UniProtKB/Swiss-Prot annotation:
Full protein name: 3-hydroxydecanoyl-[acyl-carrier-protein] dehydratase
Gene giving rise to this polypeptide: fabA
Disulfide bonds: none
Lineage: Bacteria, Pseudomonadati, Pseudomonadota, Alphaproteobacteria, Hyphomicrobiales
GO MF annotation: an example: (3R)-hydroxyacyl-[acyl-carrier-protein] dehydratase activity
Function: Necessary for the introduction of cis unsaturation into fatty acids. Catalyzes the dehydration of (3R)-3-hydroxydecanoyl-ACP to E-(2)-decenoyl-ACP and then its isomerization to Z-(3)-decenoyl-ACP. Can catalyze the dehydratase reaction for beta-hydroxyacyl-ACPs with saturated chain lengths up to 16:0, being most active on intermediate chain length.
Record GO cellular component, one term: cytoplasm
Length: 174
């Protein structure tokens, strides 16, 4: 039975990473350290900018996060690709939450703009994804717009994030 709460704590996210929320192999989140948020604070099917769904998540930023120690020595900054990956992770989670089956894969995006950085003094990152479209055929495909804020300043904007759920052996390159 699929888990349809409107929010998830860290343990719930780990359960998703272990394949315990949506069934084995279905829309699993990565496990730490690649899990890029600590909780989902809101998920629904009729909210967001387009009225087709919303998912919002948060990351508590601590100076000892794994990426600050290696990116870059003496100039710590969260890699922009990790914030982008968090947005893709959230689209995949939404697809599983709405009943989609298959393994999640990021498929691209239309546009990405960075106007700031996540640095060690930042206390909280908020991710927001507004679902634009979900298609269900041989694969489940989600298209969404998203943003990332650092201490309430929106610093990343992504348009047309694309994530697909693929049945085993049917993913890109298979």
């Amino acid at each position: 039975m699929q888990d349809r709460r409107s929010s998830y704590d860290y343990e719930g996210l780990l359960a998703c990473g272990r394949g315990e929320l949506f069934g084995p192999g279905n829309a699993q989140l990565p496990l730490p350290p690649m899990l890029m948020f600590d909780r989902i604070t809101d998920i629904n099917e009729d909210g967001g900018e387009f009225g087709k769904g919303l998912i919002r998540a948060e990351l508590d930023v601590k100076p000892d996060l794994w990426f600050f120690g290696c990116h870059f020595k003496g100039d710590p900054v969260m890699p922009g690709c990790l914030g982008l990956d968090a947005l893709w992770q959230m689209v995949g989670f939404f697809l599983g939450w709405t009943g989609g089956e298959g393994r999640g894969r990021a498929l691209g995006l239309g546009e990405l703009k960075f106007t700031g950085q996540v640095l060690p003094p930042v206390r909280k990152v908020v991710y927001n994804v507004d679902i634009k479209r979900v298609m269900r055929s041989k694969l489940v495909l989600g298209i969404a717009d998203g943003w990332l804020s650092a201490d309430d300043d929106i610093i990343y904007r992504a348009k047309d994030l694309k994530v697909g759920l693929f049945k085993q052996d049917a993913g890109p390159g298979a």
